C-alpha cells in the first residue's frame, strides 16, 4: 500500500512501482503534488499503486521532452524514400515547429492543435493543412507507442464540427484538355524551347499519363517497340538534386504504346543520339532545355559585383553592354570589382542541361504554351508571349525589344492546365473511349484494393481497343491542326502533317 511522507509544510504520496523502487505522486506535468493532509497524500498514493498493479501506470516525467526535440529524433529514425523524407522535413520545419517547438509533448492539447489548424487554414489550402495535420498525428502516434503520451491530441473525433462548408475542402477542379489541346500545347512548347524535344515529351505525357518524374527519368533501354516500361523516375529534391528512385508507390508497369507514338519517340532518339548524363551515368530519352550553367550561382554573380562596387545591377549591366553611358569613375570601380571577384559574364556553358527542372519547364515552357502568357515572376509582371506572326502559328520574339517587335500573341489553349493536368487529361480521354477501369488503373499506376478489382483482368482485346481509340483521337487532332495550317515550324510536327501522321 502507498504511504504519506511529511516534507516540511506539506505531505507527499509515495507508492511502490517495483521491488526497491518507489514513485512520488505527481501531476500530468511531472511536478510533485503537495498535499495539505496526510490522508489526502495516502489516498493518492494508494490510487497510483492500483494503476501499477493493473499495468496502467506511466511515469509522469515522460512526455516532458519538447516537441522540437522529439520531432528531431523521430525524423532521424525514419528510413523512407527521399521524396517522403523531404516532405516530412518541410512539414515539420515550416509548419509544425513554429507553433509547437518549445512545448512539452504532454503539454500539447487538442485545443492547441485545433487552434493551430484554424490559423493555418486562414493562409493555406485546406488539402495542405490536412496533410500537415496527418504528419503531426503520425508523430504523436509514435510518441504514444514509445510510452511518452497516452492519447493523441491531433486525432480527429468522428461526428464533431460543422458539416456545412466541408465541400469547400475540395481542391479546385483540375483543368484538362483534349487531343487537339495536347497537340497545340506540344507545338507551342517546342516553339518556345527552339527544339523538338518538348513536342515529343508533351505528346508522350498526354498519351501515356506518365508522371513528371517518369518522363524525365525515362531511360532509352525502357523504350520498347509497343510499350514504355516504367522502372525508375527522377525525383527533384528541394536542393536541386535529381534522385533516381522507384516510381511512386512502386508502380512498376508497362504502358502500351500506339505505333505512331513509338515511332515518334524512336525517331527522336535517333535524331538526338542521347549519351549518358554526367549525374547518373544513364542514357535518358530527354535532355534538359537550355544551357547548363557552371558559373552563375557557383561563382560571382551580377549582384555580387554590384554590391562590391556600391552600384545597382543595372549600372553593372550598362558597364558590360553600354560602357559609354556610365561615368568614368563608376566604370573603373565596377571593372575593378569584376576583376577582384573573378566575375565571368554568363559563366561557362555546356551544350545542354542534363535534365529538365520541374519549375523551369512549367514556368517558361508549359504555362506560356497553354495560356499564351509568361507568368508573373519577380521582378517582371505577367505578360503575353510576343509573337512574330509568320510562319503560323507564330514564332516567339526574343531578345531586347521583343514586345515592340511582336506582331501577334497566342490565345489560351487551356488556361490553368499544368504538366500534371496532362495525366488527368489522359485518364479523361480513356474514360471517353469507354476503357475498362482495370486497364486504366494499370496505365496510370494506380492500385484498386476493392474485391471487384481482384476479379478483373486486362485482356488483349481491351488493349487493342484502347490503342485503336487513342490512334483515332490522334489522327483527328492532326486533321484539325492541318485544317488550321498545313505546315508547322516544328520539324517533328511538320513531317506528321505532310505525311498524314
Please name every model-derived segment.
Residues 3, 34-38, 73-153, 193-194, ...:
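N-terminal core-binding DNA-recognition domain of tyrosine site-specific recombinases/integrases
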Residues 7-12, 17-111, 115, 271-285, ...:
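N-terminal DNA-binding module of tyrosine recombinases/phage integrases
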Residues 12-14, 156-163, 184-185, 217-271, ...:
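Conserved tyrosine-mediated DNA breakage-rejoining catalytic core shared by Y-recombinases
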Residues 130-134, 149-218, 251-252, 277-283, ...:
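Basic, Lys/Arg- and aromatic-enriched nucleic-acid-binding interface segment
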Residues 187-198, 208, 272-284, 288-298, ...:
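Short, basic (Lys/Arg/His-rich) helix/loop patches that form interaction surfaces
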Residues 221-227, 415-416, 435-454, 479, ...:
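Short, polar N-cap/turn motifs at the start of nucleic acid-interacting alpha helices
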Residues 237-261, 274, 307, 339, ...:
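C-terminal secondary-structure termini that scaffold catalytic or DNA-interacting sites
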Residues 297-349:
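N-terminal helix-turn-helix DNA-binding module of bacterial transcription factors
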